């Protein structure tokens, strides 16, 4: 199997499993938005955003270094991942407990900063999720580093299904916002149990692990990871901190929640890309490695036309899911979706640079975005509010994406094909223009999304971007994905 096929096959399995979050998240978000109203939904969104930001920040500090460390050990000896896995488990567990402590102590101050006194109680409840989340992530890095993509996909599917069931059940029972947060914690317990049934790294094995090998990658990636995580949800935090009410935060948070697909793609692809590319380089498969880099760059550009589809149908989609009171969410979504795709470009570029041994070059794209975003939000939010925050986020993310591509060009001497750029631009423009002139509501929104997506795919085929072999590969891989099954190859 080629390196590109391995990544496509593995990431398609993980994406299909993570894509379970789409219907579950839409059902859950729509239920909670109608049940809570803009004010309580805004408070819920703010709580989840803060804790999720902390969890993914802590994970991103070590995830790529952990995958590369385990993948290198696995290539050297298929059974030699246990010391590396034990080291990863110990680091993630300690970090999770520290995160719980910091969030517990800081919650009153965060409530005061956001002008929401009740936020402190909600944060302390959801803080219990941090160590559970981190330990589960350690198990997932082991699965990815050892090539167990199907099992990684199964774990993801259980998480999203468990979260939806528990949240809806507890809120329906009358537990309100606290019930929804408790459902998230309960889903993490389920996810950890499933992950543990597949792989069992032990902290005791870490004594035999080579800690310096992991830290050699973790340290240079630390600053880049912190910067990217600070950028994530920075717009929502600054919007609220600069005086926006809970209702505005709820509307803005709803728009952010609808940008979930790019995040799923980044989650599905980047660590698998790093694992496979690292193995190809270590095995001396230079041709396979370069082909994989080329296809990774091409793939992220082809996400933009589908962002255009979402932008064109944004208002109808927002009102269908959240209700008429969330109609302003549509305009915000049409901007934020492109910023989310730009962040995927940065994430993929970071994986390519890390695999090439140029982890410090990831700083080129990551470091400038936070100060640029802070300056932009301070200038724009007081005058333009939520719409200004969305534009600043998209613009800064685009700058970071360009810088990331420049760094990849220096490391791999490769640049996205001009033809791909032009065809992606054409398809994106057509999707936006047609979608903006086609007004739908209710169930017809799904018809609009299907028609626009089909139109984009046909455009890419007609213009020669997608070859018959690529279409066949995509259909075969997706057809073989079984994310809910415990049986894996």
Where are these regions (language model features)?
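Helix-loop junctions and terminal segments of transmembrane helices
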Residues: 59-76, 144-145, 255-298, 350-355
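Alpha-helical transmembrane segments of multi-pass membrane transport and lipid-handling proteins
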Residues: 86-114, 165, 169, 173, ...
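N-terminal membrane topogenesis motif
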Residues: 1-25, 79-82, 86-87, 119, ...
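Hydrophobic alpha-helical transmembrane segments
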Residues: 124, 153-201, 217, 367-375, ...
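Transmembrane helical elements of multi-pass membrane transporters/channels
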Residues: 9-26, 180-187, 191, 195, ...
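Membrane-proximal transmembrane or re-entrant/amphipathic helices at the cytosolic face
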Residues: 436-489
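Interhelical loop/hinge segments that connect adjacent transmembrane helices in multipass membrane
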Residues: 1-7, 177-178, 193-233, 272, ...
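Signature of the first transmembrane helix
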Residues: 5-64, 91-104, 219-242, 449
């Amino acid at each position: 199997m080629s390196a590109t096929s391995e990544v496509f096959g593995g990431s398609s399995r993980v994406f299909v499993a993570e894509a379970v979050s789409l219907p579950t998240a839409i059902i859950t978000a729509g239920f909670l938005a109608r049940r809570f109203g803009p004010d309580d939904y805004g408070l819920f969104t703010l709580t989840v955003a803060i804790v999720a930001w902390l969890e993914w920040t802590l994970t991103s500090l070590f995830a790529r270094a952990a995958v590369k460390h385990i993948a290198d050990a696995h290539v050297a000896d298929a059974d030699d991942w246990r010391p590396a896995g034990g080291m990863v488990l110990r680091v993630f567990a300690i970090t999770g407990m520290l995160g719980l402590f910091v969030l517990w102590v800081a919650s009153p101050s965060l409530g005061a900063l956001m002008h929401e006194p009740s936020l402190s109680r909600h944060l302390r409840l959801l803080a219990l999720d941090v160590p559970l989340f981190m330990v589960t992530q350690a198990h997932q890095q082991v699965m990815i580093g050892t090539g167990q993509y199907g099992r990684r996909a199964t774990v993801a599917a259980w998480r999203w299904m468990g979260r939806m069931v528990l949240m809806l059940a507890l809120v329906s029972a009358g537990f309100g916002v606290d019930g929804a947060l408790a459902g998230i914690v309960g889903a993490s317990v389920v996810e950890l149990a499933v992950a543990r049934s597949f792989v069992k790294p032990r902290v005791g094995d870490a004594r035999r692990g080579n800690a310096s090998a992991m830290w050699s990658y973790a340290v240079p990636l630390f600053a880049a990871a912190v910067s990217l995580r600070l950028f994530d949800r920075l717009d929502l935090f600054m919007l609220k901190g600069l005086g926006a009410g809970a209702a505005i935060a709820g509307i803005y948070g709803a728009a952010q929640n609808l940008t979930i697909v790019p995040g799923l793609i980044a989650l599905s692809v980047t660590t698998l890309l790093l694992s496979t590319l690292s193995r190809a380089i270590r095995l001396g498969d230079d041709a396979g490695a370069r082909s994989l880099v080329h296809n990774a760059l091409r793939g992220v550009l082809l996400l933009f036309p589908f962002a255009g589809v979402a932008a064109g149908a944004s208002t109808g989609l927002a009102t269908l899911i959240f209700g008429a009171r969330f109609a302003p969410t549509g305009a915000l979504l049409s901007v934020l979706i492109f910023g989310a795709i730009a962040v995927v470009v940065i994430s993929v570029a970071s994986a390519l640079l890390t695999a090439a041994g140029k982890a410090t070059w990831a700083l080129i794209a990551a470091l400038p975005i936070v100060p640029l975003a802070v300056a932009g939000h301070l200038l724009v939010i007081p005058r333009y509010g939520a719409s200004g925050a969305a534009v600043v986020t998209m613009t800064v993310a685009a700058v970071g994406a360009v810088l990331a591509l420049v760094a990849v060009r220096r490391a791999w001497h490769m640049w996205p094909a001009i033809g791909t750029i032009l065809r992606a631009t054409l398809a994106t423009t057509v999707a936006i223009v047609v979608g903006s002139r086609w007004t739908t509501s209710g169930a017809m929104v799904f018809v609009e999304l299907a028609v626009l997506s089909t139109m984009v795919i046909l455009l890419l085929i007609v213009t020669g971007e997608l070859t018959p072999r690529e279409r066949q590969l995509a259909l075969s891989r997706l057809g073989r994905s079984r994310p809910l099954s415990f049986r894996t190859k």
